[in-house]
Amino acid sequence: MIRFLVLSLLILTLFLTTPAVEGDVSFRLSGATSSSYGVFISNLRKALPNERKLYDIPLLRSSLPGSQRYALIHLTNYADETISVAIDVTNVYIMGYRAGDTSYFFNEASATEAAKYVFKDAMRKVTLPYSGNYERLQTAAGKIRENIPLGLPALDSAITTLFYYNANSAASALMVLIQSTSEAARYKFIEQQIGKRVDKTFLPSLAIISLENSWSALSKQIQIASTNNGQFESPVVLINAQNQRVTITNVDAGVVTSNIALLLNRNNMAAMDDDVPMTQSFGCGSYAI
C-alpha cells in the first residue's frame, strides 16, 4: 500500500512538472526584475531553431513543417491573468493569442495557416480586423509606435487589454506585446531598454524604431557579408542612441557584434519586408529604410 502511494505521488509529480508543449516559454510580471525579464528573452531565443550561426548570431530556419513552425509564450500580468501567444519560430512573428476559451488571430494568410495547429481546442475563434503589420496596427490604434509607452508596466496593461479584449485599445496593446517579445528577442538593445524599466514606462526612441524597421535589411546584409569578406553589399542606415544617423557597411559594426541577436533567413525576406512601414517619420522629416 505504501509503495503504491509513493509510486502514485511520483507519477503525479512528473505529470504536474511536465510542460504542456515542448518549447513553451513563460513570463510572470509579479515579482519580475530586469534579470528575470532577461532570462525570459534568453529562453525565447533558445526556443527558436536555427540553421547555423553567422558571426556568432543564430540564423533562423527558413521553414519547418506543421506544428513545429510554432511556439507558445505564456504571459501573466500582475493580476495573475494569463494569455498564450503563438509565434512563428522562423521569424518571431506573432500569429495570434489565446485568452481563456477564445483565440484571436491576425487577419492574414500566415495566421490563418497557424490556426490549423495552435489553439485548436479554443471554443471561439476571433479574426482581428487587421494584420500584424506595424503600419496596419498604427492605423487601427490611431497612433505611431513612438507615442506608445513600453516597459514592464506597459506590458502588464497590454496583457490585461488583450485578456479582456478591449477592441478600442487592442491594436496598441499588440504593438507593446510585439516589441516586448519578438523585437526584444531580435535585439539586445531593445531587450535592455525594456528590461530596465521594471516599474516605469518610456516612449521608444528613434534608435529602437530604426532597429525594428531594419531587421530584414541587416539580416540580409550579414548573410551576404559571410561570403563577401565581411562587407555589406548595400549599406544599412540606422539611428543611434544619440539620434544620429549611422551607416553600417560591414560586420565590424557594433549593431552586428553586440546587438542583433537573431538573423532572419533570406528565404523568408519577401514576406517580412511587407510587415513594416518602409518610410518612418523622424522629427520634421522622413527617413526611408
From Swiss-Prot:
First and last residue of the signal peptide: 1-23
Active site: 183
Stored PROSITE patterns: SHIGA_RICIN (PS00275)
Gene3D superfamilies associated with the record: Ricin (A subunit), domain 1, Ricin (A Subunit), domain 2
KW Oxidoreductase (keyword) present: no
GO biological process: defense response; negative regulation of translation; regulation of defense response to virus
Pfam families given in the database record: RIP
First-level EC class: hydrolase
Propeptide boundaries: 271-289
Disulfide bonds listed in the record: none
Keywords in alphabetical order: Antiviral protein, Hydrolase, Plant defense, Protein synthesis inhibitor, Signal, Toxin
EC nos: 3.2.2.22
Superkingdom of source: Eukaryota
Catalytic activity from the UniProt record: Endohydrolysis of the N-glycosidic bond at one specific adenosine on the 28S rRNA
Presence of keyword Hydrolase: yes
Family: Belongs to the ribosome-inactivating protein family. Type 1 RIP subfamily.
Job of this protein: Inactivates eukaryotic 60S ribosomal subunits.
Extra remark beyond the main annotation: Abortion-inducing protein. Inhibits HIV-1 infection and replication.
Protein name, per record: Ribosome-inactivating protein alpha-trichosanthin
